[in-house]
């Protein structure tokens, strides 16, 4: 029997399992660094993916804009359910993702109550005290880490945002009547609060695994923050040193944006240098990969933390540069295209529309996403994943697992089901007896609408000749190019 190398077996396991559910395995080791390479055990660790920023907090675009938010971008948010988080992580892993960078910890703003929002970081209980972690929020963060361990996904976790969208440095500084720029001043109250947040997070005990975050192998790296473009040498030096002092198990990413800091290249506590590519910054091109690798010159690991918001051919050119470009033997460890959204608990997908007109991508890709080149983007990412593992092309996707059918009040109004990871289409069946026979009432049903609005739309309605007072039974089967799932759970309803 020929044994696959360790790294390849991790990548191929979902495809080789086919109809079998993913195992609940624990990682054997932390991800480590050897010069410009990441290692999983003794094997080089490289990854490509579609960036999934919201594994721990969701912008609910279907609800529209909260006008009470004075920032002019008042978004509604919600916490993910356990079903949602498991579904998303399985979709990522089964499609070939080995690692994922999520978005930051959110910071409280004055308009949160009016917009029905909760955040991860709350104001101090007393003036000039330290911020507090919101336990109601952090249990979802705990579960994200636990599920990533269970299904085999390594996490990159940034702390605070340069920007205000989820609440960032400006909102943290407001707790202390300081300015947003004081965040980068290592003598400020805001920076002291930032340091305390880092301490609280790293030392937190996961309520699901029972382990401190600093002992969680699912965590690959801590990132100082998201797009911290005003980072100074004292800021990076003190922050990286604090993280390493608290946590000797995990790697540290300099979260600076748009430049390679020479001082970070010489800092023994910084392991990974990251950059983000966007057209608005004039760097959304494959040549930027070579420029960054030359600037880093093999002193650190190189990560393309985000790129996107352009056509699929352009994305592919950058992704192929990430896979193949070398400078004195150093290559990008990973690259993420912005951005992914997953299934909703009761059906359809979450979505987000960018200012460029691009939509978030839904895995495994759907005909409804053709204007967004969705399937093409998913496929180019899967090809890059395979190439990083030493293959020319990706293996077929595994067949989907069963979807989850939700309770039905009136099948003539709506039948809701949570789509299966990797399901492309669905068959809906009805019977008048639990044991059948089953009649197909909907075939080739898609849940892949780009802008699914659950408050106004239904995934499916039973338009057959139904008899009031009759008991009906329903089930759903997921299908993709590799096969079909077992039937879902059965939902029964007496027609009103």
What residues fall within each predicted segment?
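Bacterial N-terminal signal peptides that target proteins for export
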Residues: 1-15
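Recognizes extended acidic, P/S/T-rich segments that occur
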Residues: 427-468
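Substrate-binding cleft of secreted/luminal carbohydrate-active enzymes
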Residues: 301-389
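N-terminal signal peptide c-region/cleavage motif recognized by signal peptidases
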Residues: 21-23
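Active-site mouth of glycoside hydrolases
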Residues: 30-272, 276-284, 298-300, 311-313, ...
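An aromatic-rich alpha-helical recognition segment common to small helix-rich domains
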Residues: 403, 415-417, 428-429, 462, ...
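Pro/Thr/Ser/Gly-rich low-complexity, intrinsically disordered linker/stalk tracts
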Residues: 388-423, 468, 483-496
């Amino acid at each position: 029997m020929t044994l696959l190398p360790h790294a390849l077996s991790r990548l191929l396991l979902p495809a080789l399992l086919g109809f079998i559910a993913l195992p609940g395995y624990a990682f054997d080791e932390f991800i480590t660094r050897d010069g410009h390479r990441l290692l999983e055990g003794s094997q080089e660790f490289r990854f490509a993916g579609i960036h999934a920023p919201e594994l721990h907090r969701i912008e609910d675009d279907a609800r529209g804009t909260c006008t009470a938010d004075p920032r002019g971008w008042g978004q509604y948010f919600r916490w993910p359910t356990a079903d949602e988080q498991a579904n998303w992580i399985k979709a990522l892993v089964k499609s070939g993702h080995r690692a994922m960078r999520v978005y930051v910890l959110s910071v409280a703003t004055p308009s949160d109550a009016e917009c029905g929002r909760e955040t991860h970081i709350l104001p101090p209980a007393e003036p000039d005290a330290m911020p507090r972690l919101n336990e109601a929020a952090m249990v979802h963060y705990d579960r994200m880490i636990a599920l990533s361990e269970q299904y085999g996904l390594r996490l990159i976790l940034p702390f605070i945002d340069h920007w205000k969208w989820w609440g960032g440095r400006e909102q943290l500084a407001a707790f202390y009547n300081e300015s947003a720029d004081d965040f980068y001043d290592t003598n400020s109250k805001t920076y002291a609060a930032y340091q305390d947040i880092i301490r609280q997070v790293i030392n937190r005990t996961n309520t699901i695994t029972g382990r401190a975050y600093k002992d969680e192998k699912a965590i690959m790296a801590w990132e100082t923050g998201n797009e911290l473009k005003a980072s100074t040498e004292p800021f990076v030096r003190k922050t990286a040193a604090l993280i390493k002092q608290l946590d000797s198990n995990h790697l540290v990413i300099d979260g600076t944006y748009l430049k390679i800091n020479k001082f970070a290249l010489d800092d023994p506590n910084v392991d990974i240098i990251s950059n983000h590519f966007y057209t608005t910054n004039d760097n959304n091109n494959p040549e930027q990969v070579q420029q960054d690798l030359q600037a880093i010159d093999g002193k650190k690991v190189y990560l393309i933390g985000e790129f996107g918001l352009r056509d699929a051919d352009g994305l592919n050119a950058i992704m192929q540069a990430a896979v193949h470009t070398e400078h004195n033997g150093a290559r990008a460890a990973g690259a993420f295209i912005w951005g992914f959204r997953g299934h909703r608990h009761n059906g359809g997908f979450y979505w987000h529309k960018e200012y460029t007109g691009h939509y978030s991508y839904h895995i495994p890709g759907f005909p409804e996403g053709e204007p967004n080149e969705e399937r093409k983007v998913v496929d180019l990412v899967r090809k890059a994943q395979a190439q990083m593992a030493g293959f020319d092309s990706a293996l077929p996707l595994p067949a989907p697992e069963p979807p989850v059918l939700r309770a039905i009040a009136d099948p003539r109004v709506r039948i809701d089901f949570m789509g299966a990871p990797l399901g492309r289409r669905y068959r809906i069946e009805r019977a008048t007896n639990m044991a059948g026979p089953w009649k197909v009432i909907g075939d080739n049903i898609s849940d892949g609408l780009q802008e699914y609005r659950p408050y106004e739309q239904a995934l499916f309605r039973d338009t057959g000749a139904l008899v009031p007072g009759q008991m009906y039974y329903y089930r759903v089967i997921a299908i993709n190019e590799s096969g079909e799932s077992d039937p879902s759970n059965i939902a029964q309803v007496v027609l009103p």
